[in-house]
Curated annotation (Swiss-Prot):
One of its GO terms (biological process) is D-amino acid catabolic process. Its main location: cytoplasm. It comes from Exiguobacterium sp. (strain ATCC BAA-1283 / AT1b). NCBIfam families: D-aminoacyl-tRNA deacylase. HAMAP family: Deacylase_Dtd. Belongs to the DTD family. Keywords: Cytoplasm, Hydrolase, RNA-binding, tRNA-binding. It catalyses: glycyl-tRNA(Ala) + H2O = tRNA(Ala) + glycine + H(+); a D-aminoacyl-tRNA + H2O = a tRNA + a D-alpha-amino acid + H(+). This is D-aminoacyl-tRNA deacylase. A motif (Gly-cisPro motif, important for rejection of L-amino acids) lies at residues 137-138. GO terms for cellular component: cytoplasm.
Length: 147
């Protein structure tokens, strides 16, 4: 599982001209699932996102977690995080999980974030989405348990 985390001032996701998820300050998470993932990766990454300290304290040091700043999460499924561009000019997605498995683990990831006390908005799994965001920093991190 890969999570591309972006610290944002605001973010939203629109499907067919309808806003299906929107947040104020917090994280936009682009979440990709591979066929080798289990609930172990799901829980590890959700807990990592919850505890990661990338918000600035009074001394402008990254020392606060999303919980510390009462931030929100917009979680968007993103199978293209597993695009392989080593051969040719078109990415191959053979490392991405099949949709049924990916959706199950993506939902478990979001449930774990909620169980950790976070407000989580989502996109719509498998849909074509327009994602809008205002980066904060910018701070962008790629998280992966077995990188």
């Amino acid at each position: 599982m890969r999570v591309l985390l972006q610290r944002v001032k605001e973010a939203s996701v629109t499907v067919e001209e309808e806003v299906v998820g929107a947040i104020n300050a917090g994280y936009l998470l682009l979440v990709g699932v591979t066929h080798e993932d289990t609930e172990e990766e799901v829980n590890w990454l959700a807990d990592k996102v919850t505890g990661l300290r990338v918000f600035e304290d009074d001394q402008e040091k990254m020392n606060l977690s999303i919980q510390d700043v009462s931030g929100q999460i917009l979680s968007v499924s993103q199978f293209t995080l597993y695009g392989d561009t080593m051969k040719g000019r078109r990415p191959a997605f053979t490392k991405a999980a099949k949709p049924d498995m990916a959706e199950t683990l993506y939902e478990k990831f979001n449930e774990r974030l909620r169980a950790n006390g976070l407000i989580v908005e989502t996109g719509r799994f498998g849909a074509m989405m327009d994602v809008a965001l205002v980066n904060d920093g910018p701070v962008t991190l790629m998280l992966e348990k077995n990188a």
